[in-house]
Amino acid sequence: MINNVVLVGRLTKDPDLRYTASGSAVATFTLAVNRNFTNQNGDREADFINCVIWRKPAETMANYARKGTLLGVVGRIQTRNYENQQGQRVYVTEVVCENFQLLESRSASEQRGTGGGSFNNNENGYQSQNRSFGNNNASSGFNNNNNSFNPSSSQSQNNNGMPDFDKDSDPFGGSGSSIDISDDDLPF
């Protein structure tokens, strides 16, 4: 049997971190995941998916992820039920996350703002960040414009928004000065 889930979306609010009676950390959160198609008005709708994550990853998520943060999560679907105070049986379907990845830097999150606004708006979804993710169109992603690497050419010609480096340039070379990285920019 296979029960695998991979989601990319934005947090609708800060993760809710709690601890069980035995001391295990558990965080619940909701991801807004854009659909791959638009509705009749041309807007991209979103699905709001309830998720739960346990132990150390839950604490890490609570420390680093905020409302509007772009996340990738890997997990499994779980269905559970309980009886509410009115005696009714309530069924809950959620994604139990085994791992997550922050998909943008903290500075990118802060430049975007607090993530307010409608998640149905295409500008707030992951599609505007990376239009090739989840798109099965052969003209997107790494196959853009059918360009191939030609070592004899001095520059690659592409239209995918990536910088063009010739074979002799060193994109990591610089003035020899040190890099100033804030602790807030590190994911650990």
Curated annotation (Swiss-Prot):
Tell me one GO biological process term.
DNA recombination
Output one GO MF annotation. single-stranded DNA binding
Q: Which keywords are on file for this protein?
A: DNA damage, DNA recombination, DNA repair, DNA replication, DNA-binding
Record has DNA repair as a keyword: yes
> Low complexity bias located where?
130-163
Report the residue ranges where the short sequence motif Important for interaction with partner proteins is annotated in this entry.
183-188
Compositionally biased tracts (Polar residues): 119-129
User: What's a single GO CC term here?
Assistant: nucleoid
Span list, region Disordered? 106-188
SSB domain: from which residue to which, for each copy?
1-104
For the keyword Disulfide bond, the answer is no
InterPro entries xref list = NA-bd_OB-fold (IPR012340), Primosome_PriB/ssb (IPR000424), ssDNA-bd (IPR011344)
- Assembly and binders: Homotetramer.
Please describe what this protein does. Plays an important role in DNA replication, recombination and repair. Binds to ssDNA and to an array of partner proteins to recruit them to their sites of action during DNA metabolism.
Q: What is this protein called?
A: Single-stranded DNA-binding protein
Species this chain originates from: Enterococcus faecalis (strain ATCC 700802 / V583)
